[in-house]
């Protein structure tokens, strides 16, 4: 059942949406086109009037560089809606990038949600999608979606284990017969790794780097076990002793 749904054989005009947390991205999938949008789930807004200054990639590039009158907002926390209005504005902007007239105008929308999401958190997502014009909204637990994406058994009486490391949370789950049998999550994930890199460089190399640089370090040379060969990377930041820009290689 779920595999048919995600392959979009049983619906006509559909979109699939994965709302990433914090600095991870929101993905939108369109039938026949694949992934049509991949943008960081971030907004930059005015502190006083709440006016949107930047969304997605442009907002992410402002991390650590915003003036006092602008603040970077992460409307999604731990995989669910933390700021309803900001999330609605962000999703509306994302949809406007792929659909004319800035509305969904009829598509059926599949949205991934954490398996631990409450009824209130799920309703918030449905309300946002309905406001944008989706004629039907289907929420699917993210572990089930991940199993389908990995082409593992989902409808059969077989267990599949999946570990999903996101931006704000990491979730491990066992799925079977179109559902989640058991799942556990911790609030340690990609963002926590970035902060650990920032702290390490500050304490061991007297260098302050921003979140974007920390993320690049994690992606380029981060590993979960001792590497077979030493990877090196040059990184730029601010020398905490002099206050001037500095570059080191690790």
Sequence positions of predicted segments:
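Nucleotide/phosphate-binding catalytic cleft detector across ATP-hydrolyzing
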Residues: 1-165, 173-250
């Amino acid at each position: 059942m779920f595999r048919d749904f995600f392959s979009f054989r049983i619906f006509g005009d559909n979109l699939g949406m994965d709302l990433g947390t914090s600095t991870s991205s929101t993905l939108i999938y369109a039938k026949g086109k694949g992934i049509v949008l991949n943008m960081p789930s971030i907004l930059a807004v005015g502190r006083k009037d709440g006016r949107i200054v930047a969304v997605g990639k442009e907002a992410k590039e402002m991390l650590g560089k915003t003036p006092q009158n602008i603040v970077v907002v992460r409307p999604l926390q731990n995989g669910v809606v933390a700021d309803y209005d900001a999330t609605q504005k962000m999703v509306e902007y994302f949809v406007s990038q792929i659909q004319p007239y800035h509305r969904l105008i009829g598509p059926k929308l599949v949205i991934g949600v954490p398996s631990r999401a409450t009824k209130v958190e799920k309703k918030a997502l449905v309300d946002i999608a309905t406001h944008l014009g989706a004629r039907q909204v289907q929420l699917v637990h993210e572990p089930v979606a991940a199993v389908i994406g990995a082409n593992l058994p989902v409808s059969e009486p077989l267990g599949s284990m999946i570990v999903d490391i996101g931006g704000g949370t990491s979730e491990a789950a066992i799925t079977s017969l179109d559902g989640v049998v058991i799942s556990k999550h911790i609030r340690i994930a990609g963002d926590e790794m970035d902060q650990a890199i920032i702290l390490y460089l500050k304490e061991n190399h007297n260098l302050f780097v921003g979140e974007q640089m920390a993320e690049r370090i994690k992606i380029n040379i981060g590993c979960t076990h001792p590497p077979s060969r030493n990877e090196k990377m040059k990184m730029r930041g601010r020398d905490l002793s002099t206050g001037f820009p500095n570059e080191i290689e690790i």
